A protein has these predicted regions:
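Active-site catalytic microenvironments for nucleophilic, acid-base chemistry
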Residues: 12-16, 66, 201-205
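Mid-domain beta-loop-alpha active-site segment that forms a flexible
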Residues: 3-12, 57-59, 131-138, 187-190, ...
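Active-site substrate-recognition segment that forms the wall
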Residues: 28-30, 36, 46-50, 54-175, ...
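Hydrophobic/aromatic beta-strand patches that form the interior of the parallel beta-sheet core
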Residues: 21, 53, 178-180
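Helical element adjacent to the flavin cofactor pocket in flavoenzyme catalytic cores
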Residues: 3-51
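Short-chain dehydrogenase/reductase
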Residues: 6, 64, 199
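C-terminal catalytic lobe of FAD-dependent flavoproteins
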Residues: 98, 140-235
Length: 235
C-alpha cells in the first residue's frame, strides 16, 4: 500500500515538472554570510538553492544538524511483519492499545502486522527477534486463528518522536530552511494535509495559519501541544 501511494505521488510530481533524484544522499547544507540557505551538498553533486524543505522523518535530526540546528526529537525503530498469503479472512484494520498491536490484510492476502516502537533510541533498519516474538504473541492473543501462519519477512523503519507527540511544521532559525517532521507513526496518514500546508509555508515564506502553533519555537516558549493521551500510544 505504502509503495503504491509513494509511486503515485512521484508520478504526479513528475508530470508537474518536479525532478526526483533517487539514491541522492544529502551530505551537507551550506549557508551564506547572513545564515541563510545557500546550497546542498550531495553524493551526486552540489545543488544551489535559496529554499530547502526537509521532510526526512527519522533522519530529520541528522539533516538539520548539518545546518547547525538541534531538534527535540528521538528516533526509534518501528517494526512490521508480513505473513504468507492466505484467502481473504480479515477485511478490516484492527488495533489494540491494550496489547500494542495492529493487523490488516493486503490485497495479495498477506497479513501486515505491526506494534509499538522499540524501547531504545536507534537508527537501525533491522528487526529484533524479541520485538517480533512479543508482537506475534499479542496478535495471536487477539486472533488465535492466525497461530499456524508463517511469517515471510520483517523489517524496521525509523520514526521521529517529539516530547509532546505532535509534529513540527514551519520555519527554522536558518533563513530559507523549512521543516516538517516529528510525526511518529502518523505521518503517512497525514501526508495530503501536511503536504498542502507545508507547501504553502514554503511558497509564502511564513507559517500557514493551520500549522502556526506547531512551530519549532514551542519547545522553548513552553506552548506545547500534548497529544500523547489522544494518540494512546508512545509514538
Amino acid at each position: 500500500m505504502y509503495k503504491r501511494q509513494a509511486w503515485g505521488y512521484a508520478r504526479a510530481a513528475d508530470r508537474l515538472g518536479v525532478d526526483i533524484i533517487q539514491q541522492c544522499e544529502v551530505q551537507g547544507i551550506e549557508t551564506g554570510p547572513k545564515g541563510e540557505v545557500k546550497a546542498v551538498s550531495t553524493n551526486r553533486g552540489r545543488i544551489e538553492t535559496k529554499q530547502l524543505g526537509v521532510v526526512a522523518a527519522g533522519n530529520s535530526s541528522v539533516v538539520l544538524a548539518m545546518a547547525g540546528v538541534r531538534l527535540p526529537l528521538e528516533t526509534y525503530p518501528l517494526q512490521a511483519l508480513v505473513s504468507e498469503p492466505v484467502k481473504e479472512v480479515f477485511p478490516c484494520v484492527a488495533m489494540s492499545n491494550t496489547v500494542h498491536a495492529y493487523i490488516s490484510q493486503s490485497d495479495k492476502g498477506e497479513l501486515v502486522i505491526g506494534a509499538s516502537t522499540d524501547q531504545y533510541v536507534s537508527y537501525s533498519q533491522a528487526g529484533a527477534l524479541h520485538i517480533t516474538s512479543h508482537t506475534l504473541e499479542a496478535v495471536c492473543e487477539l486472533f488465535p486463528m492466525f497461530r499456524r501462519l508463517r511469517m515471510l519477512r520483517n523489517w524496521a523503519g525509523s520514526v521521529d518522536v517529539t516530547p509532546d507527540r505532535s509534529p513540527i511544521i514551519g520555519m527554522t532559525p536558518v533563513r530559507g530552511l523549512y521543516l516538517n517532521c516529528g510525526w511518529g507513526t502518523g505521518g503517512f496518514k497525514a501526508t495530503p494535509g501536511s503536504g498542502h500546508v507545508f507547501a504553502a509555508t514554503i511558497a509564502n515564506d511564513e507559517p500557514h495559519t493551520l500549522v502556526a502553533p506547531f512551530n519549532l519555537d514551542r519547545f522553548t516558549n513552553g506552548r506545547l501541544i500534548d497529544e500523547a493521551a489522544a494518540a494512546a500510544v508512545s509514538h
